[in-house]
Swiss-Prot record:
Cofactors (names): [2Fe-2S] cluster; Mg(2+)
Species of origin: Brucella abortus (strain 2308)
Gene3D superfamilies referenced in this protein's UniProt entry, alphabetically: IlvD/EDD C-terminal domain-like
One Gene Ontology biological process: isoleucine biosynthetic process
SUPFAM superfamilies xref list: IlvD/EDD N-terminal domain-like, LeuD/IlvD-like
Protein name as it appears in the record: Dihydroxy-acid dehydratase
EC number(s) stated in the UniProt entry for this protein: 4.2.1.9
Length: 611
């Protein structure tokens, strides 16, 4: 049996000094020999998805101690992508994922912790902690802070649901008065929690359920609802049990790499495609798979995207549907249940809470179980009161939405689309692939051709859109915004939002080697690989070149002959692969270090040390 890692610092005469320091943290004689569980929190007052986590780490810690473990809490950083959006702050968002993963590794290995409870929530925090968990491969349970309630505003004599993106779009739309913009702004983000749509944070927290590393309801139970407290309480007890099974019973089945296998990654990506999750999840799943030493690639994502239907459409794809509605329809277990019915999942694999996913679905899928407890759990409703306090309300819907024909979650037979919610496109513009969230693309523009309007940065693209330089039929092309070229692979939420503000959301396309917020919609194609800074063809496109986009056939093509491209490449090689215009962008040493090691988006934008 493997010895408890913590014995390195708690046992033996020579560890008297270490034990003395442990005693100074509150440990007693009887605590030495118990599993030491790291409570990996991410509380910060900068981020609404994390502002309520301050006391939740200690809630988990108390449950760990009542179950016979020793809990030690620390915090990671957390960047709010919405606040960092639209300025140089966004350069730090994706690199923060690596910093979070490293900081968890540093703390857990430096202090020889035996297991972890990861309390995450927003965009890069869940992926960073997931990467660390698979890197360390010690028992872990994920429990996130939960989704925000959707904003609501009385608009033209009816109640309209809102989120962050509505505020951004309205602010740039001259049809809205200042008073209307203020009304939307004040109502868009009413509570603590991760932004209310199927954006990156909620997408990733949902995927932890499919990976088997979190409890049912983790992705969809509102941050404000009292039911969410149970997830934190159970996580504290569960992690002690998992630690004992591994260290005292030699049960390797509880380890993250035994749970998050290749099949589990397939399940997670299948879920992502079915619910139209954020394109950022592609980056994060590819990165996490590499930490787990699993050969899960863009080719696998492409394969899955061709056979998985869209079973759930959530904001930004459908503005009236938010995470609170997904939970009301049975949450992630409800979507997984329909995917299982369609034969699209591997359910023989374990989870942290169940012997197999199949057994978990039999108990937690509201269309399969008569359990009063399960139906009550998924009836949790928004409270409708602005608050930053977790578990502060207990409102419920009268009954769960089990309509799989016209409800929020559909069966395969009644799918929103038989074609998946994410697609990988290939062609001479993206030889290693690029990603589009098809769930957010209007059917009228699934095939699109138009002239490229070239911008060497997100900033110049924003100015071009707001100044009326983009016309219907144009393709906005933003380059040198990839992992190396940015550096940091900025999100392009402002350009996509401003296209919508100008009435061009269904009349234009946007292509970039950067990435998109989970809040982006429209014909937005990102992660173009190789990126311009790596010598990708996107760096050879010139103003007015025609680009053909064919989502049904998964193709993207620059209509320029090979000989001309070869001439342009020779010219660019001589000039250097850098933006044609000077960018006023301060690149710190920290960002330069990330850029020096960053790999392509097709590899998850992870770091790679020089050979």
């Amino acid at each position: 049996m493997p010895p408890y890692r913590s014995r390195t610092t708690t046992h033996g005469r020579n560890m008297a000094g270490a034990r003395g320091l442990w005693r100074a943290t509150g440990m007693k004689d009887e605590d030495f020999g118990k599993p030491i569980i790291a409570v990996v929190n991410s509380f910060t007052q900068f981020v609404p998805g994390h502002v309520h986590l301050k006391d939740l780490g200690q809630l988990v810690a108390r449950e760990i101690e009542s179950a016979g473990g020793v809990a030690k809490e620390f915090n990671t950083i957390a960047v709010d992508d919405g606040i960092a959006m639209g300025h140089d702050g966004m350069l730090y968002s994706l690199p923060s994922r690596e910093l979070i993963a490293d900081s968890v590794e540093y703390m857990v290995n430096a202090h020889c912790a035996d297991a972890m409870v990861c309390i995450s929530n927003c965009d890069k925090i869940t992926p960073g902690m997931l990467m660390a968990a698979l890197r360390l491969n010690i028992p872990v349970v994920f429990v996130s802070g939960g989704p925000m309630e959707a904003g609501k505003v009385v608009w033209e004599d009816s109640v309209k649901k809102l989120d962050l993106v509505d505020a951004m779009v309205a602010a740039a739309d001259d049809h809205y008065t200042d008073e209307q913009v203020k009304a939307i702004e004040r109502s868009a983000c009413p509570t603590c929690g991760s932004c209310s749509g199927m954006f990156t944070a909620n997408s990733m927290n949902c995927l932890t359920e499919a990976l088997g590393l979190s409890l049912p309801g983790n992705g969809s139970t509102l941050a404000t609802h009292a039911d969410r407290k149970r997830l934190f309480v159970e996580a504290g007890h569960l992690i002690v049990d998992l630690a004992r099974r591994y260290y005292e019973q030699d049960d390797e089945s509880v380890l993250p790499r035994s749970i998050a296998t290749f099949s589990a990654f397939e399940n997670a990506m299948t879920l992502d495609i079915a619910m139209g999750g954020s394109t950022n999840t592609v980056l994060h799943l590819l990165a996490a798979a590499q930490e787990a030493e699993i050969d899960f690639t863009m080719a696998d994502i492409d394969r899955l995207s061709r056979r998985v239907p869209v079973l759930c459409k959530v904001a930004p794809a459908v503005s009236s549907v938010h995470m609170e509605d997904v939970h009301h329809a049975g949450g992630i277990m409800g979507i997984l249940g329909q995917l299982d019915n369609a034969g699209l999942l591997t359910t023989s694999i374990p989870t942290v809470h169940s012997e197999t996913l199949a057994k978990a679905l039999d108990h937690w899928d509201v269309t399969r179980t008569n359990s009063e407890m399960v139906h009550k759990f998924y009836s949790a409703a928004p409270g409708g009161v602005p608050t930053q306090v977790a578990f502060s309300q207990e409102r419920r819907f009268d009954k769960v939405d089990t309509d799989r024909e016209k409800g929020v979650i559909r069966s395969k037979e009644h799918a929103f689309s038989q074609d998946g919610g994410l697609a990988v496109l290939y062609g001479n513009l993206a030889e290693d692939g690029c990603i589009v969230k098809t769930a957010g693309v209007d059917d009228s523009i699934l095939k699109f051709s138009g002239p490229a309007r070239i911008f060497e940065s997100q900033d110049s693209a924003v100015l071009g859109i707001l100044n009326g330089k983009i016309k219907p039929g144009d393709i906005v092309l933003i380059r040198y915004e990839g992992p190396r070229g940015g550096p940091g692979m900025q999100e392009m939420l402002y350009p996509t939002s401003y296209l919508k503000s100008k009435g061009l959301g269904k009349a234009c396309a946007l292509i970039t080697d950067g990435r998109f917020s989970g809040g982006s919609s429209g014909l937005s194609i990102g992660h173009v690989s190789p990126e311009a800074a790596e010598g990708g063809t996107i760096g050879l496109v010139r103003e007015g070149d025609i680009i053909d986009i064919d989502i049904p056939n998964r193709k993207i093509h620059l209509a320029v002959d090979d000989a001309t491209l070869a001439e342009r490449r020779a010219e660019q090689d001589a000039a250097g692969w850098k933006p044609a215009e000077e960018r006023k962008r301060k690149i710190s040493t920290a960002l330069k270090a990330y850029a020096a090691m960053a790999t392509s988006a097709a590899r998850g934008a992870v770091r790679k040390l020089p050979d």
